Amino acid sequence: MSMPATLTKTTKLATSLIDEYALLGWRAMLTEVNLSPKPGLVDRINCGAHKDMALEDFHRSALAIQGWLPRFIEFGACSAEMAPEAVLHGLRPIGMACEGDMFRATAGVNTHKGSIFSLGLLCAAIGRLLQLNQLLTPTTVCSTAASFCRGLTDRELRTNNSQLTAGQRLYQQLGLTGARGEAEAGYPLVINHALPHYLTLLDQGLDPELALLDTLLLLMAINGDTNVASRGGEGGLRWLQREAQTLLQKGGIRTPADLDYLRQFDRECIERNLSPGGSADLLILTWFLAQI
């Protein structure tokens, strides 16, 4: 991909540094999909509420996406002198090419489209911050990503077109802004809730997998997950949020014995055909940002 004339032609960032952050993105995707048991989601135990995808699809998908993550970082660095609102337009072709490789790797199955959007944004934000020698923390990464997305919800969801996308329909019916709204707001569900929750559990000495599973429950309880709403409507979303909140109120996932509750929750999600894919995407970001 040739860089537009408005971009800096080169970046001062070392290839090793770019590859380090790209590797974290790949590890984040693998960490999420291998985490088990996850209610309604593909994991090492079963395919959740999905009949068209399996664990191996996610492994192949993550590997295909890994090769593109350095491009997002490089573009973020090379566009560092541009107005942040102009960056998203330049990221789109990279994202579309990355999606193409994902679909080729999975024979047409959409495994990680949401993660391409969110990880692409965060990787570009990391590139920009590094290029400008600015403080790189989870908060600054997410606020920089948010600056790329100013006006995104208005442009893409608030429309009166007769042919609505699934996202536009859910916004008009339920007021859910999904991945676009979370990105434009700077990922508050991650920064204000999931990430501090996860880090606190780790500080308390909880097993990292149990801590991640408990954090997933938290995200499921508070996230207006458009993946769930598209499958089960408002009723399905509210049910899933209530069930997750109930498990948290009972103490969450603190011991291996608590996994029985998650297995039952998984069975119920499968019966209802509900998959909290939006919360899974946010869990990927949570783990990724926890490494920074």
Swiss-Prot record:
Keyword set, alphabetical order: ATP-binding, Nucleotide-binding, Transferase
Entry's Gene Ontology BP terms: prosthetic group biosynthetic process
Q: What is its EC number?
A: 2.4.2.52
Q: Has keyword Cytoplasm?
A: no
Q: Catalyzes what?
A: 3'-dephospho-CoA + ATP = 2'-(5''-triphospho-alpha-D-ribosyl)-3'-dephospho-CoA + adenine
A molecular function (GO) held by this record is:
triphosphoribosyl-dephospho-CoA synthase activity
* InterPro entries referenced in this protein's UniProt entry, alphabetically: CitG, TriPribosyl-deP-CoA_syn_CitG
Per the record, the similarity remark reads: Belongs to the CitG/MdcB family.
| Purpose | Catalyzes the formation of 2-(5''-triphosphoribosyl)-3'-dephosphocoenzyme-A, the precursor of the prosthetic group of the holo-acyl carrier protein (gamma chain) of citrate lyase, from ATP and dephospho-CoA.
In its UniProt entry, what is this protein called? 2-(5''-triphosphoribosyl)-3'-dephosphocoenzyme-A synthase
Organism of derivation: Escherichia coli O157:H7
Q: Which gene encodes it?
A: citG
